[in-house]
């Protein structure tokens, strides 16, 4: 009598199985959209990695070794351009799947034993007021591709919108209250949290400037935003023209908004609401950066008075 051989559980299949649970967590509001998307993206990266290294799209979960995990981490950093924290997040997704397989007795050994993955603390870079003014003062009328990128960047510096949110910002997201104040009301693409942002004169002027732009009219958006990749490439040129040493990116604009708000005494609770943070601790990261800046700004005064003693 011959028994049937049980088909082995496959790594990417198990991953997709756990992603069904992640989707349920997303629907319940237990995790944010960006977390779920990371899990989905991790499966795609695994398939790409296995095709590249083993010429297959999946392997039995029992065949996952410590070496394969190391190779996948290397693939994330070298092939996908992941910084340390992004690579760590993806590898931890795989670790979670392996623990799921271990709990179901599909594997007998955890290949992650002895492995540690540490996220690095990253400082939030932002533009100072003089640096932002230097960007705003650039005359780019003869270089329209840079002008629209500069204007989009400045709009984000005064609203705190992330790239995906400014790209999907519709004219219907801008409202005027009974007192004539203009507001942006938009759910964040990343978390679904509502951002409620008062529009100051600068972003209002920028929105009006592009009101007749063909792309704006056709898509009913506020600004004719190009791709994130192109925008960051053009921001490098803008930084050179403005003689700014910092690495300008679309996300640095969001950090700049938080920093400028803090330095102009806007309460952190209000900043958190405008940024659409679901947890105020996320906003407090900017406050820590601000504390460091304040300390550095006091350096001249400190040098002057440190040696002075009261009689």
Kindly label every feature range from the protein language model:
Residues 154, 158, 164-165, 237, ...:
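C-terminal catalytic core of tyrosine-transesterase DNA break-rejoin enzymes
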Residues 2-43:
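Short, aromatic/basic-rich helix-turn unit that serves as a nucleic-acid recognition element
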Residues 173-180, 245-246, 266-285, 292, ...:
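Short, polar N-cap/turn motifs at the start of nucleic acid-interacting alpha helices
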